Amino acid sequence: MSTPISYQLAFGTYEDALRMVGVPSEPRTAGTVVSAARIQMFAATVQDGNPSYWDPDFALQTWGGLVAPPGLLMGWLTPLPWEPSGRPPVSAIAIRVPLPGTTFINAANEAEFPLPIVEGDRLTVVEEVVSVSPEKQTKLGVGHFIETVDTFTRQDGAVVATNWNTLFRFTPAAS
């Protein structure tokens, strides 16, 4: 029997959440390698004709292979909904931070790519909670800002991307 992906939020106190700050996650490796099919499906979806995504000869000479679009970064580590091993999938670290609040919204995102991600790479990510704000009152509701950093490496250990993200986890204000 399969184990469904659980995107259920972890609940706890602000103090519980602070215990996660600065503690790197265990490395999590993608279930599949970066592939031309996914690169081109993404590029087709956004109608991007960049030859780095479509022309194998151009991409090989320029990048060492078809290059992954930056917008696809988080998709490489999205867990498969089922694996034959029965290993349960792991949700992103921000969902595992124990806090009050039933809703979250992305507030900011910034990524840096020191090296290209190319067809055939197998990515691994280490996630870390950088900070959790004290409780804030906003027009959306009362909650906490959670800042995370994800460091992506390829099979040789080289860092290919770093992604900084800020989520607001909150209880919606009454209408």
Residue spans of the language-model regions?
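HotDog/MaoC-like acyl-thioester-processing domains
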Residues: M1-M20, P24, A108-S175
